Amino acid sequence: MSQQPGSARRVNFPEEPMTLGEKFSHRMDQLKEIIADGGCSRAAKCVSITVCLVLLVLIFGGAIVYLVMSLTSSAQKMSADSMDISPQAIRHPKFWPPTDKIRFDDLNGIPMTSLFPQNVSTCSGFGFACTGAVHMVIPSSKRCDGRRDCEDGSDEENCKECQSVFSCKLRPEEESKKKGRSTVQPTLICLTAQHLCDNVENCPDGSDEAVCKSSCSKDQFKCPGSNACLPLSAKCDGINDCADASDEKNCSKCQNNAHKCGKQCIKASHVCDGVAQCADGSDEQQCDCQRCSGTDKALCDDGTCIMRTQVCDGKKDCTDGMDEEDCPGSCTIESFSPKLKMVTCSDGKQYTEAEACSGSFESCDHDCPNSKCHPKLAFTCPASKEARKMCISRRKVCDGTPDCDDGADEINCTPIKECGIAKNTQFKCDHKCLDSSRRCDGVWDCEDKSDEKGCDKCPSGTIKCAADKKCLPAFTRCNGVADCSDGSDELKCSCQECLGVHSNTYMCNESNRCLKRDEVCSPYSMCPNATYTDKAFCAALFLKKSGTSPF
């Protein structure tokens, strides 16, 4: 069938449904034909610019409406889920976050300072805030010292006074014009000795290269192999201005606020910086907020400056352990409970005396006070000339590997071939032979703990798992690990059971649950009915470990 010119139509088969644009175009074609039939034939022959513009406006407007609706929906969902932290970015945090300005907008605005012990200060308001990242604060001792500590170098800008060995004017021509007419201090460029006489002009007037002389004045000295004349005040200031460090040798006293440590001078920027340079830690004592300032520092009330990662890390760094008091996950032990005895083991961390003498922590093998190893849980290795008595786990006894210096843990072991299984006096496990009395006694003698399984009854002073017929050592109660299949050994924990026995545990704020401190956040709080404090603690650690916090 022939078609008349001008009456051609677009054919859309059922399997090709028209889009919104096609439908609109089709309707406009129909409109043009109606107009053409009415006498305006030219309208049917030309493409209406107005129609195209209207179509574009409608499409663009529809896209904007869709985008706005999507963003609004996402925002509402984010608001509704604002208390949740994505479980996909799982971390295993072990250290305290290094800042007091982490934003807790989703946690009712709990500030970092509220999670710090009462006798530890973050010294906010002191130090220098980097211009490009105001959350980054450096101590005043690092301001204008010739070294860039801020990423944008702002700590070395607009300097009116330098703490470096050399300085020059930023704009000597302008300063000379102002001479005698202005009391404004000139802006300085601060340089270290390494930038002097290096054939690179760092100063506009080249004065950093003009200090190269064959001889120096009486109030100056010269480093071996260098022509730079340095002021005598640069000696014994804790800064190696000479390549061979000869300017810091044989110091009877220190200059420029450096700290004397034996015959060594600790430079001012390393005094009260949270890291002990002296063996006695004296460079981190008697500090104040002016010196112990910075994003990653904390000041104890006794004047000790520490890193913020040391706060609430289980190790006492300040007098009387004030940096470990009232931390999130702590609780008040009943007043009638005896004072908990703590032991510092070889890893530098604090453990309860019971833990240190149980043989369960290898870092404490040599640190049990008076070598009084637990009579049931541990095996006591005899003392030797090189070492005192050791407390090792009973699981290491007769395992084929000597752990005691004299091999006492591998003596008098019944060979596996001679194990009297038939007489029911002995049993095998982990390729060793044990007396039957070792079964179901609440002490793990086998590496796989099979000697404490399938028990109908357990002796007093141990824990019985009714669900799976296991006997557990008493110290496993409320240690943050569910050893019973039904978790009954971790239910209804008291403060004494949680913190009075274990060292690395976290008491949930408002529930009788005790968790391992380094496992309480995964990354959200694992505490049942977690409080804002529990959530804030985990949020801070998550942001620190994931690197998403701008602080």
UniProtKB/Swiss-Prot annotation:
GO terms for biological process: eggshell formation; positive regulation of protein localization to cell cortex; positive regulation of protein localization to plasma membrane; single fertilization. Disulfide bonds join 130-150, 144-159, 162-190, 168-203, 197-212, 216-229, 223-242, 236-251, 254-265, 261-278, 272-287, 292-305, 300-318, 312-327, 373-391, 381-404, 398-413, 419-433, 429-446, 440-455, 458-471, 465-484, 478-493. Specifically expressed in developing oocytes of adult germ line. Residues 70-551 are extracellular. The keyword ATP-binding does not apply. It holds the Pfam family Ldl_recept_a. GO terms for molecular function: signaling receptor activity. Disruption phenotype: Temperature sensitive phenotype with severe sterility at the restrictive temperature of 25 degrees Celsius. Zygotes exit the spermatheca with a pinched morphology and leave a trailing section behind and are polyspermic. The eggshell chitin layer is fragmented and often accumulates at one end of the embryo. Ovulation is severely reduced resulting in oocyte accumulation in the gonad and a disappearance of sperm in the spermatheca. Conversely, although sperm and oocyte appear to make contact in the spermatheca no visible fertilization occurs and endomitotic oocytes accumulate with age. Residues 122-160, 161-213, 215-252, 253-288, 291-328, 372-414, 418-456, 457-494 form the LDL-receptor class A domain. It is a single-pass type II membrane protein. Its main location: membrane. Residues 1-48 are cytoplasmic. Keywords: Cell membrane, Developmental protein, Disulfide bond, Endosome, Fertilization, Glycoprotein, Membrane, Receptor, Repeat, Signal-anchor, Transmembrane, Transmembrane helix. InterPro entries: LDL_receptor-like_sf, LDLR-related, LDLR_class-A_CS, LDrepeatLR_classA_rpt. The keyword Disulfide bond applies. Probable receptor which is required for the oocyte-to-zygote transition although its exact function is controversial. Redundantly with egg-2, seems to be required for fertilization probably by promoting the interaction or fusion between sperm and oocyte. Conversely, shown to be dispensable for fertilization but required together with egg-2 for the formation of a continuous and cohesive eggshell chitin layer by maintaining a homogenous distribution of chitin synthase chs-1 at the unfertilized oocyte cell membrane. This is LDL receptor repeat-containing protein egg-1. It comes from Caenorhabditis elegans. The lineage of its organism: Eukaryota, Metazoa, Ecdysozoa, Nematoda, Chromadorea.
